[in-house]
Regions:
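Anionic-ligand binding patches
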Residues: 2-4, 10-29, 33-191
């Protein structure tokens, strides 16, 4: 099946493409489809924002569309940055600024209170009344410094055991990540 991967985030698009193509789908990016659209994410949950994006891009592309909304939820910060993960340091800031803010916020938090999880909600829209939603999560901890060169976003700070997401190669990350788990659940539902 040809699928529109509804993301303007290069890192997410790379993961969506890698996982969906392994599932046998041909993935078209927004750039491939010449779609220049940035729907406002007004939802208060990952699921609501994923659905907003999936519906908008399905309508624009005319193709079955898979969108995700995901982020980092840190226990010691009452779930922050959560749905505001991409904008944690403010509008117009990048991953480096978000990571720097997270490190500042976590500076005095002891090791035993550094639990966090990446959360992902995937929404697949095939038409007006044909919508499938799945979620995935990955438990970990927040490091005290950046680790690794792979990945994107908060990956250099998110530790699973002794390694950060940014120290894992793509297939190793996909096997345990929030996005990999959400897409695996979607695959099972679609079978």
């Amino acid at each position: 099946m040809i699928v529109c991967a509804a993301s303007n985030n290069a890192g997410k698009l790379k993961e969506l493409r890698r996982i969906l193509e392994q599932m046998g789908h041909e993935v078209k990016s927004l750039r491939d489809l010449c779609i220049d659209l940035d729907p406002e994410e007004t939802g208060t949950t990952f699921a609501e924002n994923a659905r907003i994006k999936a519906e908008a891009f399905c309508k624009a592309s005319g193709l079955p569309t898979v969108a995700d909304d995901s982020g980092l939820c840190v226990d010691a910060l009452n779930g922050a940055p959560g749905v505001y993960s991409a904008r944690y340091a403010g509008e117009g800031h990048d991953s480096a600024a978000n990571n720097a803010k997270l490190l500042r916020e976590m500076e005095k938090i002891p090791d035993e209170r550094r639990a966090a999880r990446f959360v992902c909600s995937i929404c697949a829209v095939f038409g007006d009344d044909d919508i499938v939603q799945c979620d995935g999560a990955c438990e970990g901890t927040i490091a005290r410094r950046l680790h690794g060169q792979n990945g994107f976003g908060y990956d250099p700070l998110f530790m699973v055991g002794e390694r950060s997401f940014a120290e894992l190669d793509g297939p190793a990350k996909d096997a345990i990540s929030h996005r990999g788990r959400a897409l695996a659940a979607l695959y099972e539902k679609l079978k």
